[in-house]
């Protein structure tokens, strides 16, 4: 599971997810990618599940990049606890994903393989996504 090694503060405000992604919205490393179409928090478990689904499908071939990192702690209080007495303890980590953000990238495999691998990863995500490919250079 992905999580930061250390952070400046243990707890964070929840914040708001307004607008589209201005960074990380273009393919940087691979030729194919999985792009988010909705805003959401993606947990480190969901990121890992998507990565596993893709690696299992492509097996030895291809390289996969994970373009999102869970750097936001989500706190939870113990069950059946009375209100008050401060904020809960950090329970898990999430990545804040806005529409347009590229979540995974892939290279070194045919488009059909990449498309199917991304489809399997998309099933693990709590949001709608789309497959994006780098435009082909014509010689």
From Swiss-Prot:
Listed GO CC annotations: ribonucleoprotein complex; ribosome
Biased composition (Basic residues): 1-21
Region (Disordered): 1-23
Molecular functions per Gene Ontology: rRNA binding; structural constituent of ribosome; tRNA binding
Keywords per UniProt: Ribonucleoprotein, Ribosomal protein, RNA-binding, rRNA-binding, tRNA-binding
Identification of the protein by name: Large ribosomal subunit protein uL16
tRNA-binding among keywords: yes
Entry keyword tRNA-binding: yes
NCBIfam families in alphabetical order: rplP_bact
Lineage: Bacteria, Bacillati, Cyanobacteriota, Cyanophyceae, Acaryochloridales
Pfam families: Ribosomal_L16
